[in-house]
Amino acid sequence: FCGAPHDNDGIVEHRILRLNDFMDYFEDLGINAIYFNPVFSSDHHGYDTRDYCKIDERIGTNEDFIEICKNLHDRGMRVVLDGVFNHVGRGFFAFQDVLNNRENSQYKDWFRIDFNGNSPYDDGFYYEGWEGHYELVKLNLDHPDVQNYLLSAVDYWIDAFDIDGIRLDVAYSLPRWFMAMLKDHCRQKKADFFLLGEVLGDNAGYSRSEKLPKSFSTRDIRYTSYNRIRTHTRPERHINTIYMIHQSSRGVKSARLV
């Protein structure tokens, strides 16, 4: 949408301000919430975070995003951000410190590292990458300092941008206790804070839990919708699939998010 380059060259371009030109259009559509893919500084595609508290240079500055969020709120639209808490990019400050200081790094326990091994990047140590993607360095969410860092980042998002919700990237990879902790933390900041988790397959085990966020996305609906439309298959089959997914999560209210 913003036309930003794939690689982050560190040059600030105020592309996010283009959204101001679409405010009237969004309002005419009756949209009541905007969900943003990752907006924070990253190495490449947004899901490889460098800095959780700095808007990506390729789309603008924190001040730019504050302006966008205020304009959306003034028009009655809520703001939902993509929260990538399972992994970071290799450019993340703590991982860079490990690369430079190895065993002496104060951040070495922020990740799951074996200094007797090696990585595909020939770092001289092995670390766990998300699902074998070593450009995505898995965080050690069991470490209290990692938890505090991520929660403080969320606090900043709420305080600076007044966001209304978070979509949890790869929620199926996150420990349930972490999501429960995050939910409680966010609800203390904002009682009606919205949480949406990315789940593969059956999401009933998540959505029925009182401790977890009540809203979970499922790729089943997206995959089914795409294939029914692409193949011009009878629409009643698509409706039946959605009904089955809805029945598996009975008792959970649907969120009105456009």
PLM regions: where:
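Active-site-proximal helices and loops of the catalytic beta/alpha 8
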Residues: C69, R75, L99, A153-D155, ...
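Rossmann-like NAD(P)-binding element
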Residues: D142, G165-I166
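Hydrophobic faces of well-ordered beta-strands that scaffold small-molecule active sites
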Residues: I34-F36, V79-L81, I166, L195-G197, ...
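A structural motif
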Residues: I31, I163, L212-P213
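Substrate-binding/active-site clefts of carbohydrate-active enzymes
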Residues: F1-N32, V39-D155, A160, L182-Q188, ...
